[in-house]
Structures are given as C-alpha cells and as structure tokens.
C-alpha cells in the first residue's frame, strides 16, 4: 500500500528513538547552501517531520496531512549541526485547510496555508518563492529538496538537505501505479519512470520546483520510495492560487476548487 510520505517517518520514530529526522530525497546529492532559501523545516519535540515553502514574509504552504499540534517552523536552515547566523524560527498563528476537503480522504486537497506569528526577514539564506504564474508543462525539469534518509529502505540521514532532478510526467504514466488517483485530486506526477530518484517519507509538504517555479507539494508515493513505475505524487499548487490569494487578502471563508 502506498503511504502518505510523512507516515513512514512516524513509524520510524516509533521504531528508533535516536533517528528523529524526517526522510527525504532518494537518489540525490547535497544541495548547495544557497539554492533552498524558501525551504521551511517543520518540526516538533521529536525533530523535523515535514517541510514547507515560504511564499512571502508571513505565509508558508505545506501539505494538509502535515497538520499537527505544537509545531514550529525554521527558516534559513542547512546543516543540522551548524546553525546559520540568519536562521529564524516562527510559530503558526493561523492554519487554513480547504473547508471543502473530504476529511476521510487524505489525497483530497492536500494543501495547508499557514500564517506566521510574525514575519520573517529576507537574508542570505532566506527568501520567498512566489506562487506559479501558469500551470506546468509535461516534461518540465523539476527539482526536489529535503532533509532525511538518502536510502529508500535502510534509513540513512544526512546532515544537510539533498536535492535531485526529476521530470514532470503525464498522468497516464502514473495511473498504472496509482489506480486510486482521481482527476479531482488535482495532483501532479513527477519523477523518473525507471525509478531511483524520489521524495520519501517525512519529505511531505516540501516543494516541487519546475523551471524555477513552485509547482507542487510533496504528498504521496510508493513505499519503498524510488520504485520504477511509481513516481511521486504532488499537490498541484497552481489550482489553489485563487484560494490562497483570497485567504492572504483576508477572505478567510474562501473555498478551494471542487
């Protein structure tokens, strides 16, 4: 059974007290310290469990299934051991999940918008990534980013986030591996058909960046990660642009597209 990316990490937390970080990009390389300025680490007392994307100084976008009590967000992080001087930590002030989301369907509208308790400042390692101006095209070059396990089964945690290059695939290429996916889920399929590069458990909520734009949110995938014919599934950000812009503008009663 395919698993929501964060659930695999929660199981690991139960099995091993020492390994508390989230899982992440399989088949990647160490990210450059300056290439993930919009990446947000979402964490609690057990460690990182999800990621998010800073879209302006006061708002973060992540997956709805990352919602949890008592979490914080870290901005400008790279190494877990060596702090950047410009790292900043914020709490959520308000959280918005689509009011028309089906609560018993984890794949439906897997997106959450978070207002910070205070704005963050742009710095050498912190900068927002704006919402996409147009939908992505099949075949686009995409980048995935995250902290955690760099192996799909035996957990191996790196100190810094890893990155990998993948491609946006046609939905028809994903359908055989995910017969449960429905068009109304508003998702993107991205990865390598032959496998080997993928996001993984705990990478949930992090960005899929295609041609320099924030197009997807890590949501769903096969387990183990990186299987052939089971690319990653990402919430399609563009379809929720109007909802997010309405919330940010103050219309907190706005609903998501059906």
UniProtKB/Swiss-Prot annotation:
PROSITE patterns: TRYPSIN_DOM (PS50240), TRYPSIN_HIS (PS00134), TRYPSIN_SER (PS00135). It is found in: Secreted. Its activity is inhibited by PMSF and p-nitrophenyl-p-guanidinobenzoate (NPGB). It is an enzyme of class 3 (hydrolase). Glycans are attached at residue 44. Its main location: secreted. GO terms for molecular function: serine-type endopeptidase activity; toxin activity. Residues 1-18 form the signal peptide. Residues 19-24 form a propeptide. One of its GO terms (biological process) is proteolysis. PANTHER family: KALLIKREIN-1, KALLIKREIN-RELATED. Negative results: does not degrade the gamma-chain of fibrinogen, does not activate plasminogen and does not possess fibrinogen-clotting activity. Snake venom serine protease that degrades preferentially beta-chain of fibrinogen (FGB). Belongs to the peptidase S1 family. Snake venom subfamily. This is Beta-fibrinogenase stejnefibrase-2. It comes from Trimeresurus stejnegeri.
């Amino acid at each position: 059974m395919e698993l929501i990316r964060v659930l695999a990490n929660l199981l690991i937390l139960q099995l091993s007290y020492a390994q508390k970080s989230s899982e992440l990009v399989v088949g990647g390389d160490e990210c450059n310290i300056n290439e993930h300025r919009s990446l947000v680490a979402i964490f609690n007392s057990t460690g990182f469990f999800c990621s998010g994307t800073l879209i302006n100084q006061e708002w973060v976008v992540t997956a709805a299934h990352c919602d949890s009590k008592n979490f914080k967000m870290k901005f400008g992080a790279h190494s877990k051991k060596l702090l950047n001087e410009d790292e900043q930590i914020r709490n959520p002030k308000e959280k918005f999940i689509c009011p028309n989301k089906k609560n018993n369907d984890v794949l439906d509208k897997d997106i959450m918008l978070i207002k910070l308790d205070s704005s963050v400042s742009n710095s050498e390692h912190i900068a927002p990534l704006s919402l996409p101006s147009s939908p992505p095209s099949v075949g686009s070059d995409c980048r995935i980013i995250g902290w955690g396990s760099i192996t799909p089964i035996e957990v191996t945690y790196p100190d810094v986030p890893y990155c990998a290059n993948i491609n946006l695939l046609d939905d028809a290429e994903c359908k055989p591996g995910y017969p449960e996916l429905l068009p109304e889920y508003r998702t993107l399929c991205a990865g390598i058909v032959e496998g080997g590069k993928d996001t993984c458990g705990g990478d949930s909520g992090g960005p899929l960046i295609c041609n320099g734009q924030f197009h997807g949110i890590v949501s769903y995938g096969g387990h183990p990660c990186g299987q052939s014919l089971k690319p990653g599934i990402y919430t399609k950000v563009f379809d929720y642009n109007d909802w997010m812009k309405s919330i940010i503008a103050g219309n907190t009663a706005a609903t998501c597209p059906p």
